[in-house]
């Protein structure tokens, strides 16, 4: 009787999860106005219902955007983007854990920026499964310099489970409500690069920027995964914050290949003194050598 009861409980839990999953996928189909055939594929076969992964078609625009924002040579940035796209070892490691191809999307821009600027401390607020963290940690490993502090409300192994063991030597994970854990982190760390990829509500994103503002060193870079075009009405949270802090803001939208998602806006903010000196050539780079 006990076995039957447990079996029925597991069955009901599985059925409830499947209903929830179908509901999420139907929401996606409606929100993104997915064509009928692709909608059926999403409903029946896609394992992803959010945090979609895909390759992008406009990597050339990405290197141009990063060069425009930072003043770093475009060819250097394009080279770093090609580096991660062609890193067969990294792709094989992640694909083996992910059970599907590793598609970084806009995160290749994070990689290129880290390779070029060599930050000592990167903070990613909102790690999720760790795909972005893999790109960040790979860049830090190539630099032989720096560490990543990942934050998420969900503890491991639910978060950051994609990260291969050899990349974890530069990784620190902080579980808990970011509204509570971020202030304590700022008191003990000098954040060179902050990536907002957590709760995308305006209130929560603004809270993160408010917390980090007094602790950002000169030359710090702030990235948002949910920005909007420059001058958008209303402006996105990162642009508003950048204006308030007299910082430079720019953004770019990725173009997913073969996916119904329209692509995220990659926003970046840095000191105006960096972008205005020597035609943007004043971007801070950590020159510590391995």
Predicted regions and their residues:
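Intrinsically disordered, low-complexity regulatory regions of eukaryotic regulatory proteins
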Residues: 1-2, 122
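Rossmann-like AdoMet
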Residues: 2-99
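S-adenosylmethionine/decaboxylated-SAM
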Residues: 10, 96-290
